Design a protein with these regions (language model features):
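Transmembrane helices of ABC transporter permease
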Residues: 31, 35-48, 89, 159-213, ...
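Juxtamembrane helix-loop junctions of ABC transporter transmembrane domains
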Residues: 11-18, 41-42, 49-65, 69, ...
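Conserved catalytic Walker-motif region of ABC-type ATPase nucleotide-binding domains
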Residues: 126, 248, 336, 364-366
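An intracellular "coupling" helix at the cytosolic face of ABC transporter transmembrane type-1 domains
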Residues: 34, 131-132, 150-157, 161, ...
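A short amphipathic helical element positioned immediately N-terminal to and/or at the very start
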Residues: 18-33, 142, 146
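Helix-loop-helix
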Residues: 177-191, 261, 265-334, 339-340
Length: 600
């Protein structure tokens, strides 16, 4: 997909983008306020309780050291105080561990709620997107966003953001404790902090584009894989296995290289920051020892300070180690929100009305359209279909036949001219009522995972079983269905895998028959069935199309010889029109197409 991070995806601008992404991610957490509040409370409680440990240990060490310095047996009287501090530490650590466990359970539930809502938002917007969106982007790439990218964001929300929250608590409390113990040592300790901040920001700015590239390469690989899986029979038939494997290797290599570059650069931060923090600890140890020898700090306080300095540095190291994960999550979030924010199909205007009591008169007047407005595929197209007429549209590939269907259904709006149904401009009626006025059978059949009954009843969920069976009989598929062990309750999987293409085509025809709309579109409706099945379908169609306005688009001219009107298209224009006999008598382009198919 083009510019994945932008569509499905300046220092200041990057910071603003990160801020906006974090705000939107936080809103997803905020939709589950109780779980979020519990997570924050447990995180704070667990960390704060654990952070009292070094202070209590330092007090115990001070008491023991004071007793030994006195060189008197009475020094042992401080043992109750030491045991008190040890017991308090044990209780605090136990409570902290219990809270940490509870926190992990809360985060599992919160994570589940967030990923469910995010996937729903993505899918909800997908249902509102115009057909043009799916014409531009690969299905596998979109699936990559819904699965991989949402999971990546979710993992970051449930783990990385929680880690950041714990880091803030730990760093703040540790710094407060260090200031209360030895302010002078804090100054020494903070010498290396600017270097840590500068280095982290530098690496972050460098790796984020790499993670964007990684997500893009993975989406491209998924799209290619899905495309090849769908076309594996064609690949084998044409002996292109080696070529496909080579193409896959190229895309796979690109994805692996992008992954390696992103991870290699992302993992630099952790070791580097850890090294800087170790230098800081070395400085604290040296100056702390000098301060102790001069009597400026007690042994227990120095021990506490060193432990707090480690606790201060530890979370920073952990955050540095997840910089790569965070950048990956930001790149994934850009793609997820890019899909959520993709421009939906324009809403019907406030004046739009329902298309009711459709008679089936369709008129196209001077229609011009191009997927790229600068390159029209339909030019100044005119058509008048009377109610109940059978209109056939024929022509070579790329002539604009299927585009006509998309315009009739208002999947796209014409750039010039107008389309009317029963004298009403289709822009003035609701899209839903317009599309329900048509039944459609496409060349590429679509069956969902469900029973045969549910597939035929799709679009008319309230249909009775008798109506479904009647439609199946009319489509000449009833006998095949009844021969199956489960009959109409047979469950189809993977777009009808296990039944023939012709049978899948017949099921979609039965679906269109059941819908019984006043207008019918057949796009290559019988191109995927054998001659005998085609004859059966044609016989059923002639009876069921009576009284309906029908548009048939086919390369096989045998299917449309009885059409009331035939439009012959070439390069986006109607070059001939009339019935079969008239067009054959003209001995023009249609006659050439016909003879090319049937002569000899």
């Amino acid at each position: 997909m083009e510019n994945r991070s932008g569509v499905l995806g300046a220092d200041r601008q990057n910071r603003q983008k990160r801020g906006a992404l974090l705000l939107r991610l936080w809103r997803y957490l905020g939709r589950n306020r109780l779980l979020l509040a519990a997570a924050v409370g447990l995180s704070l409680g667990s960390n704060i309780l654990a952070l009292f440990g070094p202070r209590l240990a330092g007090q115990a060490i001070n008491a023991i050291a004071a007793g030994y310095r006195s060189k008197k047996p009475t020094g042992r009287r401080d043992l109750p105080f030491v045991w008190n501090r040890a017991a308090t530490m044990a209780v605090f650590y136990l409570l902290s561990a219990c809270m940490s466990y509870t926190l992990s359970q809360v985060m599992i539930r919160l994570s589940r709620q967030v990923v469910r809502q995010m996937r729903r938002d993505v899918f909800e917007n997908l249902a509102r997107l115009p057909v043009g969106f799916f014409d531009r982007y690969q299905t596998g790439d979109i699936l990559s966003v819904i699965t991989y990218d949402v999971d990546t964001v979710n993992q970051s929300l449930s783990a990385d953001l929680l880690q950041i929250l714990q880091t803030v608590v730990t760093v703040t409390v540790s710094l407060g404790m260090m200031l209360s113990i030895a302010p002078k040592l804090v100054l020494i300790f903070c010498v290396t902090i600017p270097a840590t901040i500068f280095f982290t920001r530098y690496i972050t700015a460098r790796v984020r584009p790499l993670f964007r590239r990684r997500s893009a390469a993975l989406g491209e690989l998924n799209g290619f894989t899905e495309e090849m899986m769908n076309g594996q029979k064609t690949t084998k038939a044409y002996g292109q296995e080696a070529a496909v494997l080579e193409a896959f290797d190229q895309k796979n290599r690109k994805a692996v290289d992008a992954y390696t570059q992103a991870e290699a650069n992302g993992t630099i931060v952790g070791p580097a920051v850890n090294c800087i923090n170790n230098l800081s600890l070395a400085l604290v140890s040296v100056f702390g020892a000098l301060l102790y020898l001069s009597g400026g700090i007690q042994l227990g306080d120095l021990s506490s300070f060193v432990q707090y300095s480690r606790k201060f540095s530890g979370p920073i190291n952990e955050v540095a180690n997840i910089v790569g994960e965070l950048q990956s999550a930001f790149a994934a979030a850009e793609r997820v929100f890019g899909l959520i924010d993709a421009e939906p199909e324009p809403a019907d205007g406030p004046e739009a009305r329902e298309l009711a009591q459709v008679q089936g008169e369709v008129a196209l007047d001077g229609v011009t359209f191009g997927y790229d407005p600068a390159k029209p595929v339909i030019r100044d197209f005119d058509l008048l279909a009377r109610p109940g007429a059978l209109v056939a549209i024929v022509g070579p590939t790329g002539a604009g036949k299927t585009t006509i269907v998309k315009l009739l259904m208002r999947f796209y709006d014409a750039q010039a001219g107008r389309i009317q149904v029963d004298g009403q401009e289709i822009r003035t009626v609701t899209r839903t009522s317009l599309r329900r006025a048509y039944s459609m059978v496409l060349q590429d059949t679509w069956l969902f995972s469900g029973t045969i009954y549910e597939n035929i009843a799709y679009g008319r969920e309230n249909a009775t079983r008798q109506e479904v069976i009647a439609a199946a009989k009319a489509a000449r598929i009833h006998n095949f269905i009844m021969a199956l062990p489960q009959g109409y309750d047979t469950v189809l999987q993977d777009n009808g895998a296990g039944i023939s293409k012709g049978q899948r085509q017949l099921l979609t025809i039965a679906r269109a028959m059941l819908l019984d709309s006043p207008m019918l579109i057949l796009d290559e409706a019988t191109s995927n069935v054998d001659t005998r099945t085609e004859q059966e379908i044609q016989a059923a169609m002639e009876a069921l199309m009576a009284g309906k306005t029908c548009f048939v688009i086919a390369h096989r001219l045998s299917t449309i010889r009885h059409a009331d009107h035939i439009l012959v298209m070439r390069e986006g224009r109607v070059v001939e029109q009339g019935n079969h006999e008239t067009l054959m008598a003209q001995k023009g382009f249609y006659a050439k197409l016909y003879y090319a198919q049937f002569a000899g």
